[in-house]
C-alpha cells in the first residue's frame, strides 16, 4: 500500500483481505484507531510496510483432529495454531477448546497477544491456537484422546525457543498435562513447550492465579493513580472460571465487596459479598463435570438471574472475566447510569468498541485486557525462566515478580496514555506494546 494512506483505507484493506473475520477486524480497528495519531507523528512506523506485516500472521497452521469417543465412534474436529509474531521472542499464547473457535477468533487473540506479551517486557512473541472441540460433557478419557490426537500434528510446530502454548478457555491444567505428555513422547524431549503445567512436572506456583491476581493488581494501581482503591468498593465480576475466581479472591483481599459471578446460563447475586468459604465452594462446584453457578446460588439461597449478565446491578467496579464482546453498549449504559467508576478487562476483548468509547466519554476509568489481564502470560514467562534454569521459585517470589510486572505495565500505559487528568489506558497500552514490537521489526529488516 501507499505509505500516505488513511486510517479508513488501511482498515478497508484489512477487511477486504478477510471479509468474514469480524472478530479480527474488530481487534485491528480498536488498536489502529488509537495508534493512528501517534503514527502520524512518528512516520518511521509507516515505512517498510510495517503495518501491513503487523496485521498478517507469520504462519497459520490448520489441521484436522481425528479421535475416538467412548462409544467407539470416530469424531473429527478442526484445530489451528496462529503463529502471529516472533519479533521479540518465541510465539506465546494459549490453546482454546470451544465450539465457537474459528480462525477469526484465533487471529484476533494472537494479534492482541502480540501487544500484551510486549507489555510484559519479557522476550515473548504472540500466538494463539485452539479447536472447535467442546470438552464440556466429555469423559476424561475422551478429553485425553482428543488432546493426544491433536498433538500428533501440532508437536512438529512447537519448541521451547519456537512456540510455547498454554491454557485458555476449555484448556486447564488437565488438558495441558495431556498435551505436554504427548509432546514429550513424540519429540523424545522434555524441554519446556507448554506453560500452565502441573507442579509435579515443571509448573510454576501462582500460575493458575496469575491472570486474576494481575487484573486486580493493575486495577488497584489505576484506581490509586486517580485517588481511589478497592477498599469498600462494590464489585461485579462476570464469569466463574479461573480468571474470575482469583480476581474475586484478590479483590476481597484488597477490601472489596464482590457481589456477582456468572456463567453462560446466568448470574448469581450475593449482596453481602463473597467470603473465602463461599468462594471455595464455588470453585469446588465449578470443578465438577457439570457444575453451574445456578447450583451455587441454590445451595446458598442467593438471587439467581437466569439468562442475564451482571451489568444491570449498581457497582463501583466492573471486571468482565468471561468472553469476548460480553459487555455491549446497552450494558455500558446501565453501568454508567448506576455510577460505575472503573471497568477492567479480565477476559480478552470482552468490551465492544462502542462500549469502550462510551465509558471513556463518560469519564469511567477503563483498563483494556492487553494490559489488565497480562498477568497470566507474564507468569507463563516466569515459568519458562524457571524451566530454563531448572529451578522452582517460592510462591512469594513469583507473586512479587507478578505484582512488579503489573505495576511496570501500568507505568507504561500512563507514559503513553495522554496528559489529561485521566489516563487513556487503551491508547497507552496500544502505543507501548506497538512501539516495542515495531522497533524490533524495523531492526530485523524485511522478513
UniProtKB/Swiss-Prot annotation:
Activation and inhibition: Competitively inhibited by homoserine and by glutamine.
GO term, biological process aspect, one: glutamate biosynthetic process
Entry binding sites for NADP(+): 211, 242
Thermal activity characteristics from the UniProt entry: The enzyme remains active when heat treated or when left at room temperature for several months but is inactivated by freezing.
Catalytic residue list: 128 (proton donor)
Record's keyword terms, sorted: NADP, Oxidoreductase
Induction per the UniProt record: Induced by growth on glucose and ammonia.
Activity across pH: Optimum pH is 8 and 9 for the reductive amination and for the oxidative deamination, respectively.
Impact reported for residue 128 to R: Reduced catalytic activity and increases pH optima for activity. NADP-specific glutamate dehydrogenase
Site (Important for catalysis): 168
Gene Ontology molecular function: any one: identical protein binding
Binding site for substrate: 92, 113, 116, 167, 380
EC number: 1.4.1.4
Cellular component GO terms, alphabetical: cytoplasm; cytosol; glutamate dehydrogenase complex
Catalyses which reaction(s): L-glutamate + NADP(+) + H2O = 2-oxoglutarate + NH4(+) + NADPH + H(+)
First-level EC class: oxidoreductase
Function comment: Catalyzes the reversible oxidative deamination of glutamate to alpha-ketoglutarate and ammonia.
Subunit structure: Homohexamer.
PANTHER family associated with the record: NADP-SPECIFIC GLUTAMATE DEHYDROGENASE 1-RELATED
UniProt-recorded name of the protein: NADP-specific glutamate dehydrogenase
Gene: gdhA
Amino acid at each position: 500500500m501507499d505509505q500516505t494512506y488513511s486510517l479508513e483505507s488501511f482498515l478497508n484493506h484489512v477487511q477486504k483481505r478477510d471479509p468474514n473475520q469480524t472478530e479480527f477486524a474488530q481487534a485491528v480497528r480498536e488498536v489502529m484507531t488509537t495508534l493512528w495519531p501517534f503514527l502520524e507523528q512518528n512516520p518511521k512506523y509507516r515505512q517498510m510496510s510495517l503495518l501491513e506485516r503487523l496485521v498478517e500472521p507469520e504462519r497459520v497452521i490448520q489441521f484436522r483432529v481425528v479421535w475416538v469417543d467412548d462409544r467407539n465412534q470416530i469424531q473429527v474436529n478442526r484445530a489451528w495454531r496462529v503463529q502471529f509474531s516472533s519479533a521479540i521472542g518465541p510465539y506465546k499464547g494459549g490453546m482454546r477448546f470451544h465450539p465457537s473457535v474459528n480462525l477469526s477468533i484465533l487471529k484476533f487473540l494472537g494479534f492482541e497477544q502480540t501487544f500484551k506479551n510486549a507489555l510484559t517486557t519479557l522476550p515473548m512473541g504472540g500466538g494463539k491456537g485452539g479447536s472447535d472441540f467442546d470438552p464440556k460433557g466429555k469423559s476424561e478419557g475422551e478429553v485425553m484422546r482428543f488432546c493426544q490426537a491433536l498433538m500428533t500434528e501440532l508437536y512438529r510446530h512447537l519448541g521451547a525457543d519456537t512456540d510455547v502454548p498454554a491454557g485458555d478457555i476449555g484448556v486447564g491444567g488437565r488438558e495441558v498435562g495431556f498435551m505436554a505428555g504427548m509432546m514429550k513422547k513424540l519429540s523424545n524431549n522434555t524441554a519446556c513447550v507448554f506453560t500452565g503445567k502441573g507442579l509435579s512436572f515443571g509448573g510454576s506456583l501462582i500460575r493458575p492465579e496469575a491472570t486474576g491476581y494481575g487484573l486486580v493488581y493493575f486495577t488497584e494501581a489505576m484506581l490509586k493513580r486517580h485517588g481511589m482503591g478497592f477498599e469498600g468498593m462494590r464489585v461485579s465480576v462476570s464469569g466463574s472460571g479461573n480468571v474470575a475466581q482469583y480476581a474475586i479472591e484478590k479483590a476481597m483481599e484488597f477490601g472489596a465487596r464482590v457481589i456477582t459471578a456468572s456463567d453462560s446460563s446466568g448470574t448469581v447475586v450475593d449482596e453481602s459479598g463473597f467470603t473465602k468459604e463461599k468462594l471455595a465452594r464455588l470453585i469446588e462446584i465449578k470443578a465438577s463435570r457439570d457444575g453451574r453457578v445456578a447450583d451455587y446460588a441454590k445451595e446458598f439461597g442467593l438471587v439467581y438471574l437466569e439468562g442475564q449478565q451482571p451489568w444491570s446491578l449498581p457497582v463501583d467496579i466492573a471486571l468482565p472475566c468471561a468472553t469476548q464482546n460480553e459487555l455491549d453498549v446497552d450494558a455500558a449504559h446501565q453501568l454508567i447510569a448506576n455510577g460505575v467508576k472503573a471497568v477492567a478487562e479480565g477476559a480478552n476483548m470482552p468490551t465492544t468498541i462502542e462500549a469502550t468509547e462510551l465509558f471513556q466519554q463518560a469519564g469511567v476509568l477503563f483498563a483494556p485486557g492487553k494490559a489488565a489481564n497480562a498477568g497470566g502470560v507474564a507468569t507463563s514467562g516466569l515459568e519458562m525462566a524457571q524451566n530454563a534454569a531448572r529451578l522452582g521459585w517460592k510462591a512469594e517470589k513469583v507473586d512479587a515478580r507478578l505484582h512488579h510486572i503489573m505495576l511496570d505495565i501500568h507505568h507504561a500505559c500512563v507514559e503513553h496514555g495522554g496528559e489529561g487528568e485521566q489516563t487513556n489506558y487503551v491508547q497507552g497500552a496500544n502505543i507501548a506494546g506497538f512501539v516495542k514490537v515495531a522497533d524490533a521489526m524495523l531492526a530485523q529488516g524485511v522478513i
